[in-house]
Amino acid sequence: MNQKILNILTIILTVILSGLQMLPNESNNVVLQWIRVYIYWIAGISAAIVIALHIIDLYRGRERHIKEWLVTFLKHILDEHLAGEIYQTRISILRVERGYKVFFKSLFYFVFSNFCNNFKNATWRNSLKDIAIHVMSDYLTVYVRYSYPKSKQSHAYFRLSDNADRNQFNGIANKCIEEGVPQFVHTVDISGIDVTQPFEKLSNNEKCKVRKYMKNSYFAPSYYGSLRLMRRISNNLYAVPIALSDQSIWGVIIIDNVSDKKCDFEKDLAPFMSSYMKIINFSLSSLKKR
C-alpha cells in the first residue's frame, strides 16, 4: 500500500478515535445518540482498521523494497552498458502469475480504470477483449521495469502457451521460460503498423512484415492478439530466464529496443550477465513463485 495513503488513513481514524472521547454525555441529536450507544464498537473497528493497515503494509513492505531495489539495479545495468548511443532501450523483469490474478488485474485496469476513456473513445469492445479470461492458465506480467527514456506503466500480459511442447509459443519470453535458456532476436521493425486492428484488415505488405516478426519472435499465429497489448513492439529482444535456488523458473528478464540497427545485447552483456543474474536471483529468492 502507498505509504502516503496509509498515513492519511491512520490520521483520519486517529481523529475519529479522539473525537469519540469528546462526545457530550447528553444530547438531543439522533446521530450523536446513536454514536454514543455504539461508541465502543466504532472505536474497536477503527482501531482494528488502523492495526490491519499497518500489518498489511508490513507484509507487503518487503516486496515493495525489493521492487525499489530491482528498479535501481536495472537502472545500473542500463546506464552502465546500454544507455547513451543505444536509445529507447527497456529492461524489464516479467514474472509468472496465475490466471485468476491476472483476470482481476486486467478487469480493473481495462474496464474500471479506463471507464471514462472507453465512453469517450468508444473503445469498450477492445477493452473487453483485453481482459485475461483464461483464469486457469499461467501468464507473464511486468513485475518491474526501467527504461531510457522513462515509459508509462505497462499492463501488458502474455499467456503462457498450452502447446509450448509443440513449439507453439506466445513470444520470446514464453520460449525462454519453457526452454530455460537465454534467447536473442533481431527482426523486422513493425512499430509503425497498427496491430490493434484485425490481421485481415492489414495491407499485404503489413501482413508480410507482421508474419515475419511473429515467426522470428516466436509468436504462434494464434497469438496475434498479444501484439495489441504491447505499448511498444520492439525488434531487438534479449530474454534470460530467472531461476531460483531450487532451480524453478520464477520469471524472465527482457531487454528490448526498437531500431533498424542490430543491438546485440547478448554479446554486449556476455561478460557481466552471469553475475547480474545471480544478484537478481538472490533478490527474488524470498518471494513466492506465483
Residue ranges and their predicted role:
Residues N236-L244:
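A short, aliphatic-rich beta-strand micro-motif
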Residues E85-V96, V185-I193, K289-R290:
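Short glycine-rich, low-complexity/disordered patches
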Residues D246-R290:
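Juxtadomain coupling helices with adjacent low-complexity linkers
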Residues K120-M230:
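Regulatory sensory and allosteric helical modules in signal-transduction proteins
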Residues G19-V30:
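Juxtamembrane "helix-exit" motif on the non-cytosolic side of transmembrane helices
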Residues K4, I8, S222-G225, V258-K261:
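Non-catalytic regulatory/interaction regions at protein termini and inter-domain linkers
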Residues M1-V15:
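Juxtamembrane interface helix immediately N-terminal to a transmembrane segment
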Residues N28-A164:
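Intrinsically disordered, low-complexity terminal regulatory regions
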